[in-house]
Structure formats: C-alpha cells, structure tokens
Design a protein with these regions (language model features):
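C-terminal structural segment of proteins
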Residues: 1-178
C-alpha cells in the first residue's frame, strides 16, 4: 500500500514517480486541482478536511478504498474516507483531532481507475467529477469489482453503489456502458 502524509502538497503527489507508477489516477487527478500555484502550497489533508463537496481528491481516493489516520491526545483511529464527510464543509473530526495520514491499500491486479472532471473552464470550478474503478476477472473477461464515486452532485462525495453493482458479473463493453 501507500501512506500519504496529510501535509503532502498536491504538486508533490502529481509529480511523484512512485504515485504515478502505482496509483496513476492520483497523479492525473492532481493535474486538475486548481492552478499550479495552488498545487504548490495546498495540501491533500487540507483539501479533505475542508470537506468542500467539489473537492477533486475525494472521488479517486474513495474509489481506491482509502482510509484516514486521525490522531488526538487520547489516541488514534482509522476510518474509511467514505465515512469522513458528514455534510457540506463538515467532517467527523472532533475538535481535538487532526488528520495525519491517508492510507491506500496495495493496487489490485487487473484493475483500472480513471478520474474525469467537467468544468466550464480549465482549472475552474467543476460542474461534476467522477472516479471509476473497475477490476476485471481475466479468466471470464467480466467485471469483478466496480466503484463509481462522484463529487459536486451531493453535500458529500457520492458512491454510486447501485451503478457499480450493475457492472459486476458483466462483460465490459460499449453496450453495457451505455
């Protein structure tokens, strides 16, 4: 797997050879985060903790099944990123807690992940974004796992679980996608 510190800048993630090799979707997604200037100083942890429903990283990280390490003076806990957001600009963080780390499981063989952002201008505020993860069963050439996660469509990132379930067990082709 991979652990990304909460203070890691967007630009560091975008330019990391290790992340590009193992989690290419994150490098590609980071290119769409605001401007280069913002990516140079903005952090992944700050982005997630702001809980902005139009945030770029959350859909891809949720599709990848990311977990968050949260620390306080009482100890630490790890939660799925999907359970981190409560409402517009609201998280499950308690007043004495901080996010310290994003944890990603090891990449799964025969899996592809893509991130797409639709906005009115390049590097502009998006209308909607989505990240799709699909794992293929190479023996049957059918979908074994699918996750479709969107932002800017609800107060928190939306995991379209029913959409993912529709793909499982089916051969992925143009007809199914339509």
């Amino acid at each position: 797997g991979l652990r990304i510190g909460a203070l890691t800048t967007h630009r560091s993630i975008e330019k990391s050879p290790l992340i590009y090799e193992k989690y290419k979707v994150l490098s590609e997604m980071e290119k769409s985060v605001a401007s280069v200037q913002t990516r140079n100083w903005g952090t992944i942890g700050g982005n997630l903790c702001s809980a902005d429903p139009i945030g770029d990283p959350a859909p891809s990280l949720i599709a990848l099944n990311a977990k968050l390490k949260i620390v306080s003076s009482r100890g630490e806990r790890t939660i799925p990123l999907e359970k981190f957001f409560k409402d517009y600009f609201t998280t499950v963080l308690k007043p004495d807690e901080i996010l310290t780390e994003i944890q990603l499981p090891p990449p799964v063989a025969h899996t592809g992940v893509v991130y797409m952002k639709f906005s009115t201008i390049e590097a502009g505020i998006k209308i909607v974004s989505t990240s799709v993860l699909i794992t293929i069963d190479p023996g049957k050439m059918t979908c074994k796992n699918a996750r479709i996660v969107m932002s800017a469509v609800a107060p928190v990132p939306f995991n379209a679980k029913k959409g993912g379930k529709l793909l499982i067990g089916n051969k992925i082709d143009d007809q199914l996608i339509e």
